[in-house]
């Protein structure tokens, strides 16, 4: 499921990233690779703040739609 469908406080794991090669590369460079745990810190209208590895990142709704996760 897309990370968009998660809520504040959820702990999920990246399953895969979909989209163009450029989008996959950009999200991969940000740490969104299969198997990586992610904590949803804040979600508002699809824009999100997440904790991944030791960083907090803001991602847009468009980016979030490309990140598939699982609980």
Where are these regions (language model features)?
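C-terminal structural segments of small proteins and small subunits
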Residues: 3, 11-12, 25, 41-71
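Short, conserved turn/kink motifs that form compact alpha/beta structural patches or helix kinks used as
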Residues: 18-23, 29
């Amino acid at each position: 499921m897309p990370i968009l469908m998660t809520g504040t406080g959820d702990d999920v794991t990246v399953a895969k990233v979909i989209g163009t090669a450029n989008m996959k590369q950009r999200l991969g460079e940000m740490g969104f690779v299969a198997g990586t745990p992610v904590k949803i810190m804040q979600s508002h209208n699809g824009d999100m703040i997440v904790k991944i590895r030791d960083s907090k990142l803001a991602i847009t709704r468009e980016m979030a739609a490309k990140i598939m996760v699982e609980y």
